[in-house]
């Protein structure tokens, strides 16, 4: 398990853009993390005041950060940054609302030099909320 302090050591993101609360599992190429979604998230002020829903693009950002924790916690990548380079086959299946816990899984499926491709999914209560293929560049 990786706690919030270690996550902050790996990622450059800070409030309100740090979207990973804890890592539950980590292996060489797969990571499982959580984001506890609360009504106090700043984006709920405008998305939408009467019916708060987590923006899909922020779910994808949370998945990207999850993958970033895995990559940046490797000794050879200490001090580097992960740059989000693209998304493909993104699907949103379930709304994410205050009180939900996003369980995010990212698996690296391809690496070539400084480019990495990840299959990622976010679930709430065991149901798929979002998924997609993410591309990253690792750099200084």
Curated annotation (Swiss-Prot):
Annotated catalysed reactions: a (3R)-hydroxyacyl-[ACP] = a (2E)-enoyl-[ACP] + H2O
Principal location: cytoplasm
GO biological process: fatty acid biosynthetic process; lipid A biosynthetic process
Catalytic residues as annotated in Swiss-Prot or TrEMBL: 47
Pfam families: FabA (PF07977)
Disulfides per UniProt: none
Keyword list, A-Z: Cytoplasm, Lipid A biosynthesis, Lipid biosynthesis, Lipid metabolism, Lyase
Enzyme Commission identifier(s): 4.2.1.59
Top-level enzyme category: lyase
Domain of life: Bacteria
HAMAP family the record matches: FabZ (MF_00406)
Protein family: Belongs to the thioester dehydratase family. FabZ subfamily.
Name of the protein: 3-hydroxyacyl-[acyl-carrier-protein] dehydratase FabZ
Source species of the chain: Streptococcus pneumoniae (strain CGSP14)
Lineage: Bacteria, Bacillati, Bacillota, Bacilli, Lactobacillales
């Amino acid at each position: 398990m990786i706690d919030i302090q270690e996550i902050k050591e790996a990622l450059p993101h800070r409030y309100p853009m740090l979207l990973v609360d804890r890592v539950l599992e980590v292996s060489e190429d797969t990571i499982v993390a959580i984001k506890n979604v609360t009504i106090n998230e700043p984006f709920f002020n405008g998305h939408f005041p009467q019916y708060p829903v987590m923006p899909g693009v922020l779910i994808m950002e949370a998945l990207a950060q999850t993958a970033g924790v895995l990559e940046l916690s490797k000794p050879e990548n200490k001090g580097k940054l992960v740059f989000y380079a693209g998304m493909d086959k993104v699907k949103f299946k379930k709304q994410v609302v205050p009180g939900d816990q996003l369980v995010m899984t990212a698996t690296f499926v391809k690496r070539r030099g400084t480019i990495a491709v990840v299959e990622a999914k976010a679930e709430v209560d065991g149901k798929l909320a979002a998924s997609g293929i993410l591309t990253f560049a690792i750099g200084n």
